[in-house]
Design a protein with these regions (language model features):
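A short Gly-Trp-Pro
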Residues: 1-131
Length: 131
């Protein structure tokens, strides 16, 4: 199990090291959300993550019938997205331990920050890659 937490330590979680996908997202929403050039995200089944501390501090943002964010209600750190298909998107920056699956590609590089240069050899997609 990998450990993760919010910025203020009010919420902690454990997640199985069984991510099915991982990527670096350069879309304008992820850049605004993080204040960084991109956001590294791992996707995993909802049943693979367990909140181990601070469940009472969780805050849901968005439509529970669609995709929504789960944040710490104290520091507002984004802990994961929940999708209707049963998967979660976990920001790798909230993990304490390193996951086995590293990001496999960059997406939305068509709208990436102009000041940032991608220096690795991972595949780059202008938008969300299909299939």
């Amino acid at each position: 199990m990998l450990r993760g937490r919010c910025a203020c330590n009010a919420v902690a979680y454990e997640v199985a090291d069984e991510f099915v996908a991982a990527y670096n997202c350069h879309c304008s929403n992820c850049r605004a959300l993080t204040g960084a050039a991109f956001l590294s995200v791992g996707q995993i089944g909802r049943d693979k993550l367990r909140v181990s501390k601070g469940a009472e501090s969780l805050m849901m943002v968005g439509d529970p019938g669609a995709a929504y964010e789960v944040r710490c209600g104290e520091c507002f750190s984004l802990l994961h997205w929940a999708y209707p298909d049963g998967y979660l998107g976990v920001p790798y920056g909230t993990l304490i331990d390193a996951p086995a699956l590293k990001p496999l590609h960059h997406q939305f590089v068509g709208s990436k920050a102009r000041w940032y240069k991608i220096l690795d050899d991972l595949p780059q997609h202008d938008e969300y890659p299909c299939c």
